[in-house]
């Protein structure tokens, strides 16, 4: 029983000492005239009367005292300091809320900053070029009197060595000035971007003649003869007109026979046998060209000319037993000659190919 009473008196004594310490702290803060801050609590003015002092160690003491007081008043629901962690953070946040505005600027400081800013702007404006027409026109006072009151700061050119070329719009002086040509007067004068006189007319870029297409071909497939410069001609214009297909085919056969006679051919041919093969190739190639439908007109070719001089090369070879028959041979050559075109040579029955003469001799 005695121990219970002693503990109760001890608690009351401790509570009294804490309240006394808080009252002393409140009086010291009230007497401090240099205090700047905001009210901390309005619900419990006995706990925190007045204002907390800025940047002092007494704030921490007040916070510790408030936490101790909250321990001895657990049943007080109206106590805002029930949770020590929440109360301490809330007080610190309220204290730091107006810290940015603690320094008040007077009128002299603001005027001084404004004056400095104006000076900096003037210096930048003096260093930069004020206009895009800087030094693009001659200074009239300098030309008339030989002196200018602005000196080096003048925006006009003092002589042709200072004159700069002005970058103009691409359509500058390419259209007529409506005001000048309707009224007879333009307020812009010589600075107008449109044409006042015929001497001011400029040729618009892109309005000149377009370059001719040097790689264009005529309908017949040959290059146009009206081209000016031969530098950009197409590869087809450099080549001569195409030869007949039969002559090209014969040349290929001769080259194959001369260069590599046994590489790709199963049989080797002599020069006379090649002369026999070439007209036959011409005839079969003509027939294949006529059978294919042409969607667009091909390049024009010259009429096919015969490679060999003999008139009896167009007929396909017949069996050996019928070679001695002169009538059938001549009729076949005549029919093939009529197919070959208008420029085929006339029939000469006296001249015969040596191979046919040998075959006819062997038959006899």
Swiss-Prot record:
Low complexity bias: start-end ranges: 113-123, 329-348
Motif window: RNA-binding: 133-138
Superkingdom of the source species: Eukaryota
UniProt-recorded Gene Ontology molecular function terms: mRNA 3'-UTR AU-rich region binding; zinc ion binding
GO BP terms: 3'-UTR-mediated mRNA destabilization; cellular response to epidermal growth factor stimulus; cellular response to fibroblast growth factor stimulus; cellular response to glucocorticoid stimulus; cellular response to granulocyte macrophage colony-stimulating factor stimulus; cellular response to transforming growth factor beta stimulus; cellular response to tumor necrosis factor; definitive hemopoiesis
Residue ranges with Basic and acidic residues bias: 102-111
Zinc finger (C3H1-type): 133-161, 171-199
InterPro entries, per database record: Tis11B_N, ZFP36-like, Znf_CCCH, Znf_CCCH_sf
Record-given protein name: mRNA decay activator protein ZFP36L2-B
Organism annotation: Xenopus laevis (African clawed frog)
Organism lineage string: Eukaryota, Metazoa, Chordata, Craniata, Vertebrata
